[in-house]
């Protein structure tokens, strides 16, 4: 259920970027207006993290996740009413606010349901929903848009979200054992006093911009710079995010294997993340190669290594903080990642790309991971959370 919830969450998120060439021509949206629309989503998504994590800790993942999914589905459906950039930005902001509950609720569920050695794998599986959405979304959305218009795509994702909420409330137990043991969660201000929370937050701050940039700008890059038609863009994104899904699951398996071989959990996560950090600058060189095919292959490696990084990064929270703080710490990290996403993947590209092209942005994104890993290494030292 976490996998399907995350998949639908990301289908709602990526549909705008995929259909932007069509939406842009109908609503007359410029690159700068698009950058502000993405910033509206990111701002709401970021602000939501400040309280969504605490809400999850206090009322439980079942109820919090269900309400949030219902709200983001409504926001997606109401997007069909947009007739200009401002209206589109408003509905995207509403979507972002409600979608900010997804990862705190999912990580909290993993912490409650799985042992240390299995958490990265479980996180990799549900987080692969982001990649499945990015795989199946482009060809499906392009087809639906060509047959029925772009507004039909938003109605489809809204309907899927409502169906998921019904299933989630039926399947999820009303209360799990960990919620009986620790009914009182922490606020994000209380979570901010934890040293490990800042390690996780800085890890998110330095790695999230790359994912957001690929998510929001990759379709436009392939269409505008590599001169691929919309159908080819859709299939190219399918391959890129297939590799992202594989990377997430392999990354979770790798650290789990190290733990089974006797490594401490946090050391295993950091070792796996170091490999990912070393690979990202190389993968970003896809922007420099003359061949569109080679570029797509390199970008697929970038998304794969990012998701391997992400599967382990998320799991460090349940490895290092008490169960009652997992949602709040995840929310604090999401806030940090959202702030950096607004700055480095929404606003700055809107000015840098028209003036200098995509190259400096791609290259910068590849180098951020080392700073995030260094901060995590210094601030996250405990290898097991007290239970």
Language model feature labels by segment:
Residues 16-17, 195-249, 306, 310, ...:
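Extracytoplasmic gate region of multi-pass secondary transporters
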Residues 47-86:
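Conserved MFS/SLC helix-loop-helix module at the cytosolic interface between two early adjacent transmembrane helices
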Residues 14, 42-50, 134-135, 241-245, ...:
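Residue-level signature of mid-helix packing/kink "hotspots" within the transmembrane helices
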Residues 126-170:
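Helix-loop-helix hairpin linking two adjacent transmembrane segments in secondary transporters
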Residues 174-201, 225:
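Juxtamembrane intracellular "pre-TM" segments in multi-pass secondary transporters
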Residues 28, 60, 81-87, 115, ...:
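Helix-breaking motifs and short loop linkers at transmembrane-helix boundaries and internal kinks
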Residues 71, 75-78, 86-94, 294-301:
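Paired small-residue
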Residues 91-130:
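Cytoplasmic helix-loop-helix junction between adjacent transmembrane helices
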């Amino acid at each position: 259920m976490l996998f399907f919830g995350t998949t639908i969450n990301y289908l709602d998120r990526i549909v705008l970027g995929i259909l932007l060439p069509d939406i842009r021509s109908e609503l007359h949206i410029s690159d700068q207006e698009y950058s502000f629309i993405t910033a509206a989503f990111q701002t709401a998504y970021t602000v939501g993290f400040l309280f969504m994590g605490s809400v999850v800790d206090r009322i439980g993942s079942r109820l919090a996740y269900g309400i949030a999914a219902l709200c983001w589905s409504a926001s997606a459906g109401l997007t069909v009413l947009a007739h200009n950039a401002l209206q589109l930005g408003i509905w995207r902001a509403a979507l972002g606010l409600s979608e900010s509950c997804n990862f705190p609720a999912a990580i909290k569920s993993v912490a409650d349901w799985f042992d240390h050695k299995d958490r990265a794998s479980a996180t990799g599986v549900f987080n692969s929903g982001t990649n499945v959405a990015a795989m199946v979304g482009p060809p499906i959305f392009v087809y639906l848009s060509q047959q029925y218009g772009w507004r039909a795509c938003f109605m489809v994702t809204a309907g899927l979200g409502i169906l998921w909420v019904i299933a989630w409330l039926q399947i999820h137990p009303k209360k799990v054992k960990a919620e009986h043991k620790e009914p009182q969660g922490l606020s994000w201000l209380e979570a901010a006093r934890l040293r490990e929370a800042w390690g996780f937050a800085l890890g998110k701050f330095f790695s999230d911009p790359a994912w957001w940039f690929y998510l929001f700008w990759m379709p436009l890059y392939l269409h505008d710079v590599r001169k691929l038609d919309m159908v080819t863009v859709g299939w190219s994104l399918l391959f890129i995010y297939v590799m992202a899904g594989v990377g997430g699951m392999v990354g979770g398996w790798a650290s789990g294997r190290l733990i089974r071989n006797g490594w401490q959990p946090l050391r295993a996560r950091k070792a796996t993340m170091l490999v990912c950090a070393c690979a990202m600058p190389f993968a970003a060189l896809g922007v420099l190669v003359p061949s569109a095919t080679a570029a797509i292959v390199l970008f697929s490696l970038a998304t794969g290594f990012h998701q391997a990084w992400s599967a382990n990064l998320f799991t460090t929270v349940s490895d290092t903080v008490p169960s009652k703080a997992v949602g709040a710490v995840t929310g604090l990290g999401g806030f940090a990642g959202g702030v950096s996403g607004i700055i480095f993947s929404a606003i700055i590209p809107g000015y840098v790309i028209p003036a200098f092209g995509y190259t400096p942005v791609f290259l910068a994104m590849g180098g951020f991971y080392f700073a995030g890993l260094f901060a995590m290494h210094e601030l996250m030292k405990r290898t097991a959370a007290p239970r």
